[in-house]
Amino acid sequence: MEETKELFRALEFAHYAERFRDSIFVIALPAGAPFSDLLLDFKVLAGYRIRVVLVTSDPDFQIEQVISQANQRGSRFLLSLLTDLLFRPEEELLNLDFQRVATSLEQGRMPVIAYHGAEAVSAAHPIDPTYRLGAQVALRLGAQKLFLVGRLAATLRSALPRSSVQASELEGLPDRLAATGLPQAVPLCTFIAAQLALGIPDVVLLEGRSGHLFREVFTYDGAGILFTATRASRIRRAGMRDVTDMTLLLRPEVESGAILPVLESRIEANIDNYWIYEIDGMPVGLAGLKRYGEYAELAQFATLPRYRGRGRARELAQFLVEQARAQGFRFVFALSIDPRMWEFFQYLGFQPIDREELPADWRGGYDLSRPSRALLKEL
């Protein structure tokens, strides 16, 4: 079992490395952020051809020395110092040679945009100037993600119901944060909403701890808070190109014991039974619809952890119930060992039923020693 987990982790890593290959990520590190602690994260991203631009404050003139030492160990940082930069919106980028930045990215180097002088964060200027500069750099370069590194990430992540927030959900978030004792997060959330509206696809709030950037980029669970532009969603049939995504989506359910292990070859052989919930081209949920005579089974529900809690599994289940009805089935049924799923299906109108009443061809292939409950809905 441990070997299987290791293989899943390797598959997950390889999957995301390929997905983000040649993407541009801008990482904003305010004064006091542990630049040295993140060097290994930066090196891993760059090693898998993710193009990284670092924007950081260097009030103590330490960055140049850190970068020099890192480059001696094989890193490929390229330092651009913006000395005594005045952070007025119309002047922030006057001293920055974007052609040099773009060229260095094409050469596989990591540009570091560092400055020495800026006004302090205050009531009049509540957003760290590093974040403001990082956002403008991200917009100018067409970055896929803007990472805002800071201490507030851990507090805010524990206060939010999930680790992903869509732009449409940001409208009421400042009031909720103020009411829950986090007024300091309100200006930042307003700033993030503005950057999404301007065209940055993803903004990530992240703690400056070693390994957190790696986890955010290369794992399904992530490590920070992902703020995304509101994107188009749809339900579609699964195809062979989805098999790796489907395997990784099912992994947490398999590891918890909620779903029996499923080989990729088994998924491929039954690919026509599966449906995908997709957001902006990325599979975030799946379920299967299997035929047993006049019965159809809803099976193998899985949702990407940070996309749960928004009714997507319910929407997918209702869609599949209608598919079963349109295909002429008389009944749909589902089984689970998870009490939350029992409630889920009962909410959709399913009623408990003895497993012995289910089709004989289904019973012949099921391990009845599993402590699952069956639920049925007549169409």
Features from the language model and the residues they span:
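C-terminal catalytic "cap/lid" subdomain
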Residues: 1-261, 265-266, 309
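Residue-level detector of beta-propeller blades
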Residues: 161-164, 283, 352
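A conserved beta-strand-loop-helix scaffold within acyl/acetyltransferase catalytic domains
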Residues: 259-305
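Short hydrophobic/aromatic beta-strand or adjacent loop that forms the aromatic wall/cage
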Residues: 272, 369-376
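Conserved acetyl-CoA pyrophosphate-binding loop and the N-cap/start of the following alpha-helix
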Residues: 307, 311-319, 329
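Conserved GNAT acetyl-CoA-binding A-motif
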Residues: 324-337
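Conserved catalytic-core motifs of GNAT/GCN5-like acyltransferases
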Residues: 333-335, 346, 351-370
